Amino acid sequence: MRRRAVFAPALLLAGIGLAGCAALNTVYADLSTWGDWPAGRAPGSYAFDRLPSQQSDPAAADRVEAAAKRALTAAGFRPAGADEKPDVLVQVASRTTRTGADPWDDPLWWRGGFGLRRHVWAGSVWVMPGPFDRTRYERQVAVLLRDAASGRPLYEARAANEGSTLGSDSLQAALFSAALIDFPRVGPNPRTVRVALP
């Protein structure tokens, strides 16, 4: 009996800790999809199709395409071979927009304020507290699938999320996974989806 009383709280804390770790690897994204993927058509082979603006910075385009490859594979696509004509041309794009809100944007709800504060380490000092660095980053990826033979757009997806950090390549890959999570279905736009970081 005493042994159970000791292990039960430990197991509970371990479970809470594992749930917390799983939450750190989850990305929520707002997803919008459009298109008319032909019924019964398999995903097939693909090749990336770069716009002229993307060709001016090949290293950046390579990073975006590398982030999208895992999502395309999960959706059932495979890269076209060197001598193979692709079934689908894929255009991918990614952008991050930084915005910074001023602390006085909304004076009725401003968290700052002047006042006399007592600090143990400094005594009484005048301070202006508050979270003044409220930088937000909106990250967005887009995928456009075109029929290689006709050039007709078949499927378009956009996934976006925002946070207080710039993000990373793995976050970008997760956003591409979110963009193609429902492929080939289109759904109510926008909708929130959840994916794991790779």
Named regions from a protein language model:
Residues V92-S150, V186:
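Surface-exposed short loop/turn segments
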Residues A19-K69, T73-A75, V92, P190-P198:
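A structural "domain/chain start" motif
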Residues R3-L11:
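N-terminal export leaders
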Residues A80-G100, R194-P198:
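Acidic helix-start/capping segments at beta-turn-to-alpha-helix junctions
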Residues A42-G44, A75, P86-V88, Y137-A142, ...:
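Envelope-exposed proteins and targeting segments
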Residues R50-A60, G76-R78, P131, A159-L166:
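Second-shell loop/turn segments in exported
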Residues A22-D36, F132-P198:
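C-terminal/domain-edge helix-coil "capping" segments
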Residues Q55-A66, E84, R136, L166-A174:
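Soluble non-cytosolic domains of exported or imported proteins
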